[in-house]
Design a protein with these regions (language model features):
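A generic structural signal for short beta-strands and their flanking turns/coil linkers
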Residues: 10-12, 22-24, 68-74, 85, ...
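Hot-dog-fold acyl-thioester-processing enzymes
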Residues: 28-57
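Hydrophobic residues in beta-strands and at strand termini
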Residues: 28-30, 78, 125
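HotDog/MaoC-like acyl-thioester-processing domains
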Residues: 80-84, 88-128
Length: 128
């Protein structure tokens, strides 16, 4: 990520890494600001991580185009409780149209094949 992170991304202490397949991964370390009940992540922190992963992936795909993604719907499915360890997220663009983009994001901890949450986010691609 860069030095001009939105305040919520800074609060979550998000950082990026390159995955083995070259995909950008978003990483959220476990810390006091993301705790829900003791030993578990807060659902809002997980949703924020998923949204930043989706937005980041879409922003990379839109590089060089004068379009700015604006979320119009977000659906999060919580699959497992997020525990007290680093959480990773990545996103896949399912559809990139002229005006709308559909992105799916997944969050996991130990094993990418066992997600703790997923999100489907629809973006309006707005021109300046």
């Amino acid at each position: 990520m860069n030095d001009s992170l939105p305040p919520y991304a800074e609060l979550l202490q998000l950082r990026t890494e390159q995955g083995e397949d070259g995909q950008t991964l978003f990483v959220m370390p476990f810390h006091d600001d993301v705790v829900g009940r003791p030993g578990y992540l807060h659902g809002g922190a997980i949703a924020g991580l998923l949204e930043f992963a989706a937005y980041g992936e879409l922003s990379l795909a839109l590089r060089g185009r004068d379009l700015h993604p604006k979320p119009i719907s977000v659906t999060v499915d919580y699959l497992l409780g997020g525990r007290d360890r680093d959480t990773y997220a990545a996103a896949v663009i399912e559809r990139l149209g002229a005006r709308i983009a559909n992105v799916e994001a997944f969050a996991w901890q130990k094993d990418r094949a066992t997600p703790i949450a997923s999100a489907r986010i629809n973006f309006l691609l707005a021109a300046d």
